Amino acid sequence: MTPVRSSSLSLLLLLSLVALVKAGIMIPQSPGCPKTEDKNFPQHVRVNLNILNRSTPARRPSDYSKRFTSPWTLQRNEDPERYSSVIWEAKCSHSGCINAEGKEDHHMNSVPIQQEILVLRREPRHCPNSFRLEKVMVTVGCTCVTPIVRHIS
């Protein structure tokens, strides 16, 4: 499994759980489970950070990002105070877009595609087992767009 796919999968699972809880969708519970409406309901929960299905194969060729009209490279974003500690982010390779001849065309712009994800941040810092949920904006790829042209009259 590629680093990007592994991080994406674990964050998608975490986001799904948070969405279910926030939406108030009932998940079957044992009769002894506390009610979330109870003011004594804990604000802290225990989470198993082991990722299921780590061996899921990647489904794209390794040169995928280089074949776009707006190619990118992946850069490692590492933060030991965050889970996942490594997030791979895209960086656009050109300011323009690549035409059919493989040349950069500056009549189009290569721009980053960003996605907000949820990560777990250690809190307080350096505590191995204490985290809080945090939103992070990451660049997941690049795309080609027409430039914004402003005419001065």
From Swiss-Prot:
Glycosylation site residues: N53
InterPro entries named in the record: Cystine-knot_cytokine (IPR029034), IL-17_chr (IPR020440), IL-17_fam (IPR010345)
Signal peptide: 1-23
GO cellular component: extracellular space
Tissue and organ distribution: Highly expressed in adult heart, skin, and intestinal tissues, such as jejunum and ileum.
Annotated S-S bridges: C92-C142, C97-C144
GO biological process, one term: innate immune response
Record localization: Secreted
GO molecular function, one term: cytokine activity
Keywords tagged on the record: Adaptive immunity, Cytokine, Disulfide bond, Glycoprotein, Immunity, Inflammatory response, Innate immunity, Secreted, Signal
Quaternary structure (record): Homodimer. Forms complexes with IL17RA and IL17RC receptors with 2:1 binding stoichiometry: two receptor chains for one interleukin molecule. IL17A homodimer preferentially drives the formation of IL17RA-IL17RC heterodimeric receptor complex. IL17A homodimer adopts an asymmetrical ternary structure with one IL17RA molecule, allowing for high affinity interactions of one IL17A monomer with one IL17RA molecule (via D1 and D2 domains), while disfavoring binding of a second IL17RA molecule on the other IL17A monomer. Heterodimer with IL17F.
Protein family (similarity comment): Belongs to the IL-17 family.
Its job: Effector cytokine of innate and adaptive immune system involved in antimicrobial host defense and maintenance of tissue integrity. Signals via IL17RA-IL17RC heterodimeric receptor complex, triggering homotypic interaction of IL17RA and IL17RC chains with TRAF3IP2 adapter. This leads to downstream TRAF6-mediated activation of NF-kappa-B and MAPkinase pathways ultimately resulting in transcriptional activation of cytokines, chemokines, antimicrobial peptides and matrix metalloproteinases, with potential strong immune inflammation.
Name this polypeptide is given: Interleukin-17A
Organism (species): Sus scrofa (Pig)
